C-alpha cells in the first residue's frame, strides 16, 4: 500500500502533467481562431471556382477540356492524403490514414494501380512503414500547386484516371468530419454540399454570393470559353489541394484542443481521487 510520501509525489507528478496539457490546450485554442479565419476567407473562393468552372463548361465544346472527361477504363488513380506533422491530437491522424488505406485497398481490388501523395510526416511515415512510397510529398501552397500540375498533366496524358483527396474537415472548433473528395474527373457536387457547412460558414458564403450576384444574359469570353475554362481548371486543382491543407490544419488544432482538454480533465479527476 502506498504511503503518504508516494501519494504526494504522485499528486505532484499529475499536477505537473496537467499544467502542460492545459497550456497545450490554450495554445491550440488560440491557433484554432487563426486557422478558422484562413478557412473562412478561402471558402468563398473555393466555392466560386467550382461554380464558375461548371457554368463555363456549358459554353464550351463538350470535349474542350480533357479534365472534365470521364475515362472509359480506370487503370490508375492518385490518392492525396492530408494528415499532420505532429501527434497528440486524438484520432485525427489515425482516422484519415485508415480511411485512405481502405480506399487504396478498395481500388486495388478493382484492379486499379494506386499512387499516393502525402501531406504531413504522419502520413509519410504511415505509408512508408507499409511499403508504399509516396510519389509526391507536399506541405505548402507552392508544393500544392506543383501537385496540381502533376495531377492535371497525368489526367490529360492518360497516366491517371481518377484523383481523390482525403482529409479532415473542421466542421467547428470541437468537431472534425472525414472528407473523401473526388477531384478528377471533376465532381459537380458543390463544396457546400460536400463539406456540410456549419451555420457560420453558410452565413459567410451567403453574404459573399449576395455581394457577387451572377450577371444576367449572355456571357462573352475573352479570348474564348475554352481558354477561360483551361485557366479555371488549373485554379480549381490548385485550390482543391490548398483548401484541403487549410481545412485540415484547422481541424488538427480542434482535435488537439479536445485531446488536451480530455487529458486535463482526467488529471483533475486523478488528483481529486488521490486527495
What are the residue ranges of the model-derived segments?
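C-terminal beta-strand-loop-alpha-helix "lid" module of Rossmann-like NAD(P)-dependent dehydrogenases
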Residues: 1-275
Amino acid at each position: 500500500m502506498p504511503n503518504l510520501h508516494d501519494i504526494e509525489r504522485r499528486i505532484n507528478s499529475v499536477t505537473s502533467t496537467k499544467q502542460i496539457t492545459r497550456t497545450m490546450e490554450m495554445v491550440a485554442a488560440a491557433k484554432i481562431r487563426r486557422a478558422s479565419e484562413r478557412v473562412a476567407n478561402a471558402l468563398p473562393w473555393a466555392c466560386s471556382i467550382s461554380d464558375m468552372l461548371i457554368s463555363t463548361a456549358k459554353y464550351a465544346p463538350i470535349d474542350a477540356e480533357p479534365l472534365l472527361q470521364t475515362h472509359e477504363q480506370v487503370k490508375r488513380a492518385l490518392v492525396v492524403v492530408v494528415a499532420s506533422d505532429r501527434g497528440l491530437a486524438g484520432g485525427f491522424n489515425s482516422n484519415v490514414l485508415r480511411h485512405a488505406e481502405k480506399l487504396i485497398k478498395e481500388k486495388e481490388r478493382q484492379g486499379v494501380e494506386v499512387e499516393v501523395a502525402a501531406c504531413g510526416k504522419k502520413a509519410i511515415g504511415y505509408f512508408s512503414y507499409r511499403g508504399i512510397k509516396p510519389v509526391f510529398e507536399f506541405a505548402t501552397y507552392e508544393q500544392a500547386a506543383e501537385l496540381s500540375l502533376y495531377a492535371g498533366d497525368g489526367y490529360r496524358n492518360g497516366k491517371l484516371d481518377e484523383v481523390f483527396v482525403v482529409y479532415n474537415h473542421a466542421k467547428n472548433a470541437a468537431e472534425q468530419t472525414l472528407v473523401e473528395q473526388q477531384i478528377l474527373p471533376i465532381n459537380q457536387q458543390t463544396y457546400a454540399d460536400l463539406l456540410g457547412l456549419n451555420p457560420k460558414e453558410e452565413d459567410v458564403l451567403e453574404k459573399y454570393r449576395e455581394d457577387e450576384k451572377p450577371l444576367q444574359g449572355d456571357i462573352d469570353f475573352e479570348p474564348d470559353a475554352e481558354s477561360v475554362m483551361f485557366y479555371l481548371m488549373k485554379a480549381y486543382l490548385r485550390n482543391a489541394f490548398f483548401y484541403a491543407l487549410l481545412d485540415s490544419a484547422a481541424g488538427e488544432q480542434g482535435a488537439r484542443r479536445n485531446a488536451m482538454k480530455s487529458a486535463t480533465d482526467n488529471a483533475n479527476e486523478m488528483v481529486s481521487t488521490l486527495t
